[in-house]
Amino acid sequence: MTDTLDLKLSSRRQWNPVRCPVRLEVDGSAQTPTSLVQTALNNPSFDLVIAAPNGQNVYIPFTEDRKLFTANIADDPSTSSLISHCHFEGVTEDGRHALSLCDPGEITGLLMTQTNRFGLSTSNNGSFVLIPYVENNCDLGSLVHSSSRKKRQIGKQNTVIDRNPSYIREHLDGRKRFVELALVADYSVYTKYDSDEKKVNDYMQQTMNILNSLYFPLNIRITLVHSEIWKKGDQISVIPDSKETLNNFMEYKKIMLKDHFFDTGYLMTTLKFDEGVVGKAYKGTMCSYDYSGGIYVDHNNDTVETVATFAHELGHTFGMDHDPNDKDVCYCPMPRCIMNPQSGHMEVWSECSVKNLASGFNRGIDLCLFNEPGKKPSDAKCGNGIVEPGEECDCGPLKCDNHCCNGSTCKLIGEAECASGDCCDLKTCKPKPRATVCRAAIGICDLDEYCNGETNDCPADFFVQNAALCPGKENEFCYEGGCGSRNDQCAKLWGPTGKNGDENCYRKNTEGTFHGNCGTNAHTKEIKKCETENAKCGLLQCETQAERPVFGDPGSVTFSHSTVYSSLKRDDKKFCYVFKSAYGGLNAPDPGLVPDGAICGEEQMCIGQKCHKKEKISKVTAQCLDNCNFRGVCNNVGNCHCERGFGGIACEIPGYGGSVNSNEAYRFRGITLSSTFLVFFCLFGIFIGGLCVYYRVKRKRNLVSEWWSVVKKKFDLHGDLVPVRKAPPPPYAQRIRQSFTAMWGEDHSHVAVAQPAHPRNCYNSCCRQPPRFDPPSIPMVTLKNPNLASPTPLLNPAEKEEQNQERATHQHVELYPVAESFRSDSAASFNTRTGSFRPNVQPPPVPRPSDDVLSKLNEDLAKEKNAKFDRLNKTLPLPPPLPKEKPKTASSTSLRRNESIRPEQAPPPPPPAHAKPTLPTKQPKVSEDAAATEEKVDVRSMAAIFDQKLKK
């Protein structure tokens, strides 16, 4: 979108020019700054003589330049009082000289010579000085010689001056073009000039005066048709980001276009942009509704240097690129030219800049530059076929068959909005819709142009960047909109069977004959011989099966063929067909020659029948950012022509395709790759969801579960098999105990309540007690049915009878102790508390080892732990004798089984008796499931099953 190499402040050393004192004279009288300003106010024209100390005298006739602004600005009540008629121009053989005499302290001028440029200003003592901008000397050069010419001869110089570089005359067509410019000064400029509106207007007109001197050699006239000064603050966001500021101003420019017509618009500011940027502009967008314009910084007190920055950015709008540093690639007659990437005193156009400008004119970038601004409507001639100021349309001198235009008044009819142009729909008399193709591509290296829906004109012609690969081709390059394909050119001349000839055929181009050459001189008709390095760029050598060419009129073409051999055996004969027509000339090459862009060596391509390095061509070609992110191609002015769905200078943002030069290519963004995937997955999800609902409702199947089962089985998916330990039951929770017959599938469970080891309210540290190890409790079995005998313990008949009688006398549920093991003749018994078998026979006693064995074990243990071991060989002393027993008294405590000896003193008094808690009168609640299970218990069958399992 924008110039990728912005104009930046020069990093070269500070320029310290000499100051050349001069004396100015008018009509033989010496002038002071005040008297010169007074002379300019009283005389619309005067002859100025510049006298240098070295005796050189220069004569320049100056005339007031009233074409710097149009009549609409002078007639505007808000600006007419601020227009100063103090800007003069003088035309000589060396160019256009500019002089502004609005204030004695602000005199500014630009004087041109063939080899130098001088700035005219005043010194502190009130005298005049010349400041050289190119050669640091005071030699006025060619100005001295031109002063000998007569006044009437100099005054007639109103066209391109002969002293301009020769390449300007070679590339430009000599037609004069007019640029209608809108210039806006932001609030920072207004404050810089003391918030004085008149000073700002004088400075803007002074800028236009010097700008016209710089564009005068190119035969381009720039006129200020609209100006604005933001006196109450900026109307847009002016920030250090130059790119964002440029985009903001382009949006504001569209608002200005609603009330004022102009070709391009620029914003002037004093704000310093990031990275030292002093100017930024869109490239190749002159006459564009959306992007014709730019911004620049008033960065220097020297007006000439600031205007050079303005001229640089305006050159980008014309399609000019930065000058390369290689003088062999791009010729510049002075050390620095205007399109140099670094700012400074640059007042000359390089050969590359002129070529870029001529290329833009050939593509129609100047379609809006032929109407002369300031021309009065009364000067227009209705019926001449040219839309002039004051006319809305002009359908020519003959009968007007355009129903959108009134041929007698040259006005639009009714609600018509346009009457001509490639983007005007003559059926509706309105601009064609946006993204309508108005100029189709004529080859693979050309690009389509589109209407923007706002204007009736088609954009200028743009094409693929020079030296870029032809789309879809290998080793064939684009140049000036054409593809350098030898095969395609041969097929164009000879039909479908035509293709590039053998490599040996091109050796004939060094002979300079009809069968091989590098073209013919258009003036002398002399056949030119190719140099050896250019042999592949001369006459196109084709291979075909056709008898004659299919291109051109038979009377205007000539063809022939020759024979070559690729080996010494002469058994592989090749035919080389050549073509010559009368269609070639000065401006168009002969179609029988090798097309520009054809490969002629490694990283080399043909241009103008000469083989050039591709790198040399790329140096003078505008480059695109980031290779357009592989979403488009780079056009000839360095802007990306994007695919559908993308936009921006590098196709990095969503957009409508196309480019800022060719306009948007589509009316809607279309479906991008990301949106395609999004829509696909959404539709797929809806389909799967509907299918699952259908199977769930209609066929009672869960497709998700079935699919997941198949996936787990197919890919062997499973979770981590980590055993999970069950948490212990909470306090006072019911604990279910299984019967020992549960392992055989007979579960006789009962429910018991676990009592806490500590009081419920002991949670604080003060209530904590040391652990207490109680003896194991006796398992209890709850029996509800008194008619069923307890499975344990096994009782003899007498005990069973006593037990039955006791059950008969008690009606409530009782708890019976369960023995730890069965009293049977079996080898082992089952422990209902621990759930394990224990042997019924006591284990044999283990005898105590002897003292020697124990001593040996202790010694080994001491060695293992590196401890000292002392063997005791001495006899241990005998224990003291027991005290004699005293005779028993009445108060003495008798021994019980000689287990302990009571102390002689009386025992302490017993603790006070506490009332025992009353037993609950309500019977404990027993689970109904457990009761139901107990009713089915059969002790005999259980014992039989148990014995059977033990036998196995």
Curated annotation (Swiss-Prot):
The Disintegrin domain covers which part of the protein?
A: 379-466
Membrane-spanning residues where? Answer: 673-693
What is the disulfide pattern of this chain?
A: C287-C368, C330-C352, C332-C337, C438-C458, C624-C634, C628-C640, C642-C651
What is the role of the protein in this entry? Metalloprotease that cleaves and releases a number of molecules. Negative regulator of lrp-1 protein levels, potentially by influencing its endosomal trafficking. Involved in regulating the molting process.
Q: What is this protein called?
A: Disintegrin and metalloproteinase domain-containing protein adm-2
Q: Which residues are glycosylated?
A: N125, N301, N406
- GO molecular function of the protein, one example? metalloendopeptidase activity
Q: Which UniProt keywords apply?
A: Cell membrane, Disulfide bond, EGF-like domain, Endosome, Glycoprotein, Hydrolase, Lysosome, Membrane, Metal-binding, Metalloprotease, Protease, Transmembrane, Transmembrane helix, Zinc
Which species does the entry assign this protein to?
Answer: Caenorhabditis elegans
Q: Which SMART domains match?
A: ACR, DISIN
Query: Active site at which residues?
Result: E313
Entry's free-text remark on domains: The peptidase M12B domain does not require a conserved Zn-metalloprotease consensus motif to contribute to regulation of lrp-1 protein levels.
